[in-house]
């Protein structure tokens, strides 16, 4: 979920099937839900959360280091109602894969996650949170495939180009990488 209507429309038609999509809008009616905000916890906690739930090729290296990384930087998200963090679609999981292979310095991780302006996503996690959702009047609304799929693809292309530039550029020192963070005192 996103609070950015334009991004939600792009995500509604990001599939390559030439079909129009739908965007829905909800509001949360329970102000007492627990929200785990990874922007407050930091990029390393977010990376650990992604590693818990996404496949980075399941290489031997990933299997060896990810559990240590999760133990060191992860947080217990099991008791929260809503998770707030950087958008983590499949194209951006490339960042995690490169991080696992020590190709990305931690100093550029947050900048990489912000490329493409994908913003923040919300994960409604608990039954209590789902029960607290109410539909906003006037939704769902149709989303034109041609317009918003083109926007999605252009945003993705620009972000991938910028990722490649940043990863291969001078800002990426590749010194404070996953293996050094796991083994060191970072």
Annotated model-derived regions:
Residues 1-15:
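Extended catalytic/binding region for NAD+/ADP-ribose chemistry, centered on the ART fold
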């Amino acid at each position: 979920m996103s609070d950015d209507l334009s991004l939600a429309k792009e995500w509604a038609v990001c599939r390559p099937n030439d079909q129009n999509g739908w965007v829905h809008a909800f509001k949360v009616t329970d102000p007492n839900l627990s929200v785990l905000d990874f922007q407050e916890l930091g990029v390393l906690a977010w990376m650990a959360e992604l590693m818990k739930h996404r496949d980075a090729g399941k290489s031997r290296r990933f299997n060896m280091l990810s559990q240590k990384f999760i133990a060191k930087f992860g947080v217990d998200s099991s008791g929260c109602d809503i998770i707030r963090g950087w958008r983590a679609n499949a194209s951006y999981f490339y960042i995690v894969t490169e991080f696992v292979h020590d190709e990305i310095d931690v100093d550029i991780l947050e900048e990489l996650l912000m490329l493409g302006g994908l913003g923040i996503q919300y994960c409604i996690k608990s039954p209590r949170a789902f029960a607290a959702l109410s539909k906003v009047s006037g939704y769902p609304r149709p989303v034109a495939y041609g317009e918003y799929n083109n926007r999605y693809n252009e945003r993705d292309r620009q972000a991938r180009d910028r990722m490649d530039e940043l990863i291969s550029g001078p800002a990426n020192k590749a010194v404070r990488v996953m293996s050094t963070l796991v083994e060191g005192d970072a």
